[in-house]
Amino acid sequence: MYSAVTRGIEVTVEPFYLEVQSEPEENRYVWGYRVTIVNNSSETVQLCSRYWQITDANGHVQEVRGSGVVGEQPVLDPGASYQYSSGCPLTTSSGVMVGRYQMKGEDGAQFEIEIPAFSLDVPEQRRTLN
């Protein structure tokens, strides 16, 4: 698992290879990832948008921006957590993802929190990208 804390908000990511959905002979590799966001701060916050930077083993970069996550813009009270799962296809057997969430505090001010960098690796070809 990979974890980062920004302003008392912890983001943990657990990636996993989806062998059943992958077709290596067609250069199609698919991973899922489970994200848990825990609000350890003293204020209620809302997740407004997301930004991902996805880099494959050949150095090709894809950027993904969007409103909320999985169709939601969750509100997290102090001590609350939110979890969701999503996926990422690549044309290489490894890659790395990193990103950030745009959050809104109780006063309406927006701020960014870090999504930790995490590697996407085919289990039998495990390697880490920095």
From Swiss-Prot:
A Pfam family that the UniProt record links to this protein: DUF525
Signal peptide as annotated in the record: none
GO BP, sorted A to Z: error-free translesion synthesis
Disulfide bonds listed in the record: none
InterPro entries on file: ApaG_domain, ApaG_sf, Uncharacterised_ApaG
Domain ApaG: residue ranges: 3-127
Domain of life of the organism encoding this protein: Bacteria
HAMAP family on file: ApaG
Protein name: Protein ApaG
Naturally occurring in which organism (per UniProt): Brucella suis biovar 1 (strain 1330)
